[in-house]
């Protein structure tokens, strides 16, 4: 039996939550990552009674929340805007704990290579605050990989002196955006990985990561600069990647994420089978 658990990003089905739970259960998955936390499932729209109902539904289907998404429209690169974003993130961490997970994943913006620049310092300040709060809850605010190579992210995390800000490792983002090796990333980030996405893809043309990760621009670059693909069809070497995760002692979730419009349900089912096949070898 594999030590990994397989889950799915709930928004990828584009269905009501209860139908997503039913589909995940039928696939024999073990968890769901909750998304749409800026609107339908935001802390302000999720009273305690609703949270309990969602948990009851999950548990009755043998599922748990692997994590929730911290869907910020912006990264933490603007000091004036950060105060509100940090408060929003704290409320998401509170909600995560009530939903019986201790992980909120998000993008924080593109970490500059120059650690002495103002943007780097602004992002550090925000992440110091998030790490302190996460530590107080026994939780993690997990940065999703992709906008920078893993060595840059590792140096940034080391500067915080806390595991309160950790890593959600998305191997496809590393491949598609910055051309980084996911296996190397596993070893670089081994002390911080608390959650992972199972996603695959290819880089087509090197692009400006600041544009690629700008909310208003992201969709238009798919197919021009990068392409997301079903698991096993892109440039992520999943056998080696999973072996590396096992080697560092990771035993958490592999959450299938399929963000394209066509064939999502089919690709999620295929992905679950693909992962199981690798994990049984």
Which residue stretches match the model-derived regions?
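N-terminal pre-domain/capping segments
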Residues: 1-101, 135, 162, 272-281
């Amino acid at each position: 039996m594999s030590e990994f658990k397989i889950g799915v990003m709930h928004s990828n089905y584009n269905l009501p939550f209860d139908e997503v739970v039913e589909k995940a259960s039928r696939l024999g998955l073990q968890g769901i990552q909750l998304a749409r936390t800026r609107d339908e499932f935001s802390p302000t729209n999720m009273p305690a009674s609703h949270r309990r109902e969602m948990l009851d539904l999950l548990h009755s289907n043998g599922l748990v929340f692997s994590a929730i998404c911290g869907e910020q429209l912006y990264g933490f690169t603007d000091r004036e805007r950060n105060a509100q974003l940090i408060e929003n993130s704290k409320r998401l961490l509170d909600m995560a704990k009530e939903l019986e997970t201790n992980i909120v994943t998000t993008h924080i913006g593109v970490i500059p290579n120059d650690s002495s620049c103002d943007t780097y310092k602004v992002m550090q300040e925000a992440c110091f605050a998030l790490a302190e709060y996460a530590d107080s809850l026994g939780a993690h605010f997990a940065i999703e990989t992709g906008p920078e190579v893993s060595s840059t992210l590792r140096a940034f995390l080391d500067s915080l002196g806390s595991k309160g800000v950790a890593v959600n490792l998305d191997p496809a983002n590393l491949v598609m955006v910055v051309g980084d090796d996911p296996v190397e990333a596993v070893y670089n980030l081994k002390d911080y990985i608390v959650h992972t996405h199972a996603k695959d893809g290819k880089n087509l043309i090197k692009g400006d990561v600041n544009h690629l990760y700008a909310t208003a621009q992201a969709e238009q670059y798919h197919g021009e600069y990068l392409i997301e693909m079903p698991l096993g069809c892109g440039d992520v070497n999943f056998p080696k990647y999973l072996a590396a995760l096992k080697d560092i002692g990771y035993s958490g979730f592999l959450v299938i994420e399929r963000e394209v419009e066509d064939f999502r349900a089919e690709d999620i089912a295929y992905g679950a089978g693909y992962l199981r096949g690798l994990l049984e070898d």
